[in-house]
């Protein structure tokens, strides 16, 4: 054990508690790594310097356009598992249909996961009256929350937040594509918590490997991280982490924390990330980032502006039916047309978001609207002047 850790009053038995405490205080980079590891080199491999805010001089992103008939999904009073709220749906497109796996809350205030299906991405005419995934393990006793779906080969991997009433952790489960399509929910396989004992949320897997390693976005407050692993089993390694983006300074829209949103979407210009940020008034807004196609730890673009903020009645949550007012928060997005593996500037995406943590809404934008023209020009190898 590092002598600096002992000098600080720590011992081996208390190490896990110390790790959780320092990360929860947002002191992970400068305090925890060198305290435990003792050398700057080793520390930088695990917790390198954060990107403090938007890259200087970058142009603003275009705004998302709300679907005219929001919300696309509401609670159902006679469904016990979702009689109070539905929110934060992970989305995946299979065989031409959009499958929305969403967080459902009933009278017991425990989060379970429901399923709705749409032919056009907006009208969800098929909907189950029972959950497809519910708490079973101790770590998720009080809820399985905020699912995000990624297809890797012939399996669908789902990251979600496991909540035991005290700590929220990133958990991972998977199911064969065929079993999902045929609704064989007993085929779900739980892989466990990804970073056991650490308060962590907003996780999403990339659908491809990078140098034979899988990659996952997640958030240890207040930063957005990317982590690599040679395997998909849990737990993931303690090394191969990088802080991708940090909360901004001052009174910006993402000043207190920033985190992931939808699963990564592959575009010709990079991996498109719909993110979220929170300000000092505790208002949740959406933003956008772009990371390199071959190295998702390389941030290419971070929107200086938000692309959606709470404005309408569903998002502001002014009535007694709303759970948390002034929130827009996404867990999923899909291409509007077709199932293209890589999107171009004129391809449109549908972003699903929880509004006031109470209903699910949809918004759209073309990739070219979210990624500014200058950046798209430069990514094609041209010089912008």
Walk through the language-model features, giving the residues of each:
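Beta-rich carbohydrate-recognition and catalytic domains
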Residues: 2-84, 88-142, 151-204, 208-256, ...
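Canonical pleckstrin homology
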Residues: 329-330
